[in-house]
Design a protein with these regions (language model features):
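Contiguous alpha-helical scaffold segments within structured protein domains
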Residues: 49-75, 79-82, 104-105, 149-247, ...
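Short, surface-exposed beta-strand-loop junctions and turns on beta-sheet-rich folds
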Residues: 16-17, 24, 158-159, 293-295
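Short coil/turn segments at secondary-structure boundaries
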Residues: 94-99, 125-130, 217-218, 234, ...
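An anion-binding catalytic pocket shared by soluble metabolic enzymes
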Residues: 2-6, 12-13, 98-169, 186, ...
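An N-terminal JmjN-like helical accessory module and its immediate linker preceding a catalytic domain
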Residues: 1-43
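Conserved hydrophobic core element of enzyme catalytic domains
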Residues: 213-320
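N-terminal leader/transition segments
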Residues: 8-9, 44-54
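Terminal domain-start leader segments
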Residues: 1-15, 55-109
């Protein structure tokens, strides 16, 4: 259950999409993309909050009643946190993201109200057979404009004043810069803003640079999975993934979805990482959230942050 798939599919419009689950090997993307598999029942929608639309898995307008089926205890989370804390102390990791979950039985399939839960964030729903991952606050990952301006996104930290959250964001940005320098990319414009995800606020950094489109596949191999979702250095995070992932596994959480084609807003490529969302299957709703960990944080603080994120996600479907 909750196992990710991997595919590159061709949409009816001719656009190509790559979907890769976390921690699984996949080939680099060439331009144009290699078509590996065509899934007729695979549906994807990527919209902006300015689009006035509500996405429903059913047309039901009934209140959504969720009955808790399972959740990770604090003691379980704390034991995983202790292992990762040692890795941070020994400087094997400069940042790690520990994810947790709650699983509910739903009375009706949930729907998302995109407009009321986001400020300037991409919104999406993705479906493969009877499993749906959808949410109102994923992370933008990489975009490329028609004039070959690349934009990398980093969203990290939930406090506007905390020095620890500031460090978390700095680690995320510097990890991307380190990878870009390996490609000889040294001229990078960095801008920061505050992004709202439900009731939470995050520091949002955008790294803009010019590069050849042929670098797309190599860049994705180098910077995905990003530190904002799993940790840094990523190789060391992978060695500890059993302590980072939620009890039921990652599923679609953290997976990369990219679309190559021409968009009305002047982009040639846009991609998102599937986080802060819900997995829905047979009226089971799984909510997953992770928190970025650096030195000098406690298990209590990080577990509480995860609970706030879980609550925010549930709020995006009108449940609590």
């Amino acid at each position: 259950m909750w196992q990710p798939n991997e595919c590159i599919i061709q949409l009816k419009s001719g656009k190509l999409l790559k979907f890769a689950g976390p921690f699984i090997e996949y080939e680099s993307i060439d331009v144009p993309c290699l078509l590996l598999k065509n899934l007729d029942d695979f549906k994807l929608r990527i919209l902006k909050p300015s689009v006035i639309e509500e996405c429903s898995l059913t047309r039901s307008k009934e209140p959504i009643l969720l009955k808790l089926q399972s959740e990770e205890s604090f003691e379980s989370y704390k034991s995983r946190f202790a292992v990762i804390s040692k890795e941070l102390e020994w400087e094997r990791l400069s940042k790690a993201v520990i994810a947790t979950e709650k699983i509910f039985q739903a009375s009706t399939l949930p729907r998302l109200n995109y407009i009321n839960t986001n400020d300037d964030r991409i919104i999406f729903s993705i479906q493969n057979n009877d499993l749906v991952f959808f949410g109102a606050t994923p992370d933008e990952f990489l975009e490329i404009s028609k004039d070959h301006i690349f934009t990398l996104y980093s969203v990290a930290g939930t406090s506007l004043t905390s020095s620890v959250d500031k460090l978390e964001n700095e680690v995320s940005v510097s990890s991307m810069m380190n990878e870009l320098k390996k490609f000889g990319i040294n001229s990078v414009e960095i801008t920061q803003s505050v992004a709202r995800s439900g009731e939470l606020y995050h520091v949002k950094s955008m790294l803009k640079f010019r590069a050849n489109l042929s670098l797309l596949g190599s860049l994705i191999d180098a910077i995905y999975p990003p530190s904002t979702i799993f940790g840094y250095p990523i190789k060391n995070a992978l060695r500890n993934k059993q302590f980072l992932m939620p009890p039921s596994g990652y599923g679609y959480y953290g997976s990369l979805v990219g679309v190559l084609g021409e968009f009305d807003d002047g982009l040639l490529f846009r991609s998102i990482c599937l986080i802060r969302g819900l997995e829905v299957k047979n009226h089971l709703v799984r909510v997953i959230a992770g928190s970025g960990i650096v030195k000098n944080r406690s298990a209590e603080q990080e577990f509480e942050e995860c609970q706030l994120k879980l609550k925010s996600i549930l709020g995006s479907i009108g449940a609590s």
